[in-house]
Swiss-Prot record:
Residue ranges, annotated region (NMP): 30-59
Species of origin: Trichlorobacter lovleyi (strain ATCC BAA-1151 / DSM 17278 / SZ) (Geobacter lovleyi)
GO BP annotations, alphabetical order: AMP salvage
Residues reported to bind ATP: G10, A11, G12, K13, G14, T15, R127, G199
Family stated for the protein in its record: Belongs to the adenylate kinase family.
HAMAP family reported for this sequence: Adenylate_kinase_Adk
Compartment annotation: Cytoplasm
LID as annotated region, ranges: 126-163
The protein's name: Adenylate kinase
Quaternary data: Monomer.
Pathway(s) the chain acts in: Purine metabolism; AMP biosynthesis via salvage pathway; AMP from ADP: step 1/1
Positions annotated to bind AMP: T31, R36, G57, L58, V59, G85, F86, P87, R88, Q92, R160, R171
Gene giving rise to this polypeptide: adk
Purpose: Catalyzes the reversible transfer of the terminal phosphate group between ATP and AMP. Plays an important role in cellular energy homeostasis and in adenine nucleotide metabolism.
Lineage summary: Bacteria, Pseudomonadati, Thermodesulfobacteriota, Desulfuromonadia, Geobacterales
Length: 214
């Protein structure tokens, strides 16, 4: 089963990706992981990517797509894969389709976890962690016994810069601008599965599993 997984920050995408990996026995593949693996392995494309990244540049689509093609040709992808964070643009989606078509494959389903923006803001902006031991909390769902103080070591709690409300809203805006055209693209190809991302982890897993057998 060849899958793509979309989801805004804070939607629980990592948890659901792991569910797909364990349920269907297919690897989760992210662009970042692929680039790092290619660089570490010293492949020709990995060497090119490393040179660009060292100079602070953006790795071109040609290199990224080459690395994607190499990764999808590996033995562990024989039964399928879960692409996470790729494609990011319509040209990348078109190129991915060509890569797969060349080996007689296609994207079977695109899973899009749908969570209201305000819910995401509440989830992420409420997160706190201990400045000393790193234990995580949430002001609403998992608060400390004493406000602002770690239950374990008594140190102060801090909020990550990424979890500040303004930052979260900006990340959501970027996500929507980036994925809205892709969702339309895959909807027109009748492979988009929009999954409500509100509920327990198990409930969301059940929705995904049901969508994949339709």
């Amino acid at each position: 089963m060849n899958l793509i997984l979309f989801g805004p920050p804070g939607a629980g995408k990592g948890t659901q990706a792991q569910f797909l990996v364990e349920t269907y026995g297919i690897p989760q593949i992210s662009t970042g992981d692929m680039l790092r693996a290619a660089v570490k392995a010293g492949t020709p494309l990995g060497v090119k990517a490393q040179e660009i990244m060292i100079q602070g540049g953006l790795v071109s689509d040609d290199i990224v797509l080459g690395i994607v093609a190499e990764r999808l040709a590996q033995d562990d992808c024989a039964a399928g894969f879960v692409l996470d964070g790729f494609p990011r643009t319509i040209p990348q989606a078109d190129a991915l389709s060509v890569i797969l078509k060349q080996v007689g494959r296609a994207i079977d389903h695109v899973i899009s976890l749908e969570v209201d923006g305000e819910e995401i803001v509440n989830r992420l902006s409420g997160r706190r962690s201990c400045s000393s031991c790193g234990k995580g909390y949430h002001l609403v769902f998992d608060p400390p016994l004493r406000a602002g103080v770690c239950d374990v070591c008594g140190s102060g709690l801090v909020q990550r810069a990424d979890d500040q409300e303004e930052t979260v809203r900006n990340r959501l805006l970027v996500y929507e601008q980036q994925t809205a055209p892709l969702k339309d693209y895959y909807r027109s190809r009748q492979v988009l599965c929009s999954i409500p991302g509100i509920g327990s982890i198990v409930e969301i897993q059940q929705r995904i599993a049901a969508a994949l057998v339709e």
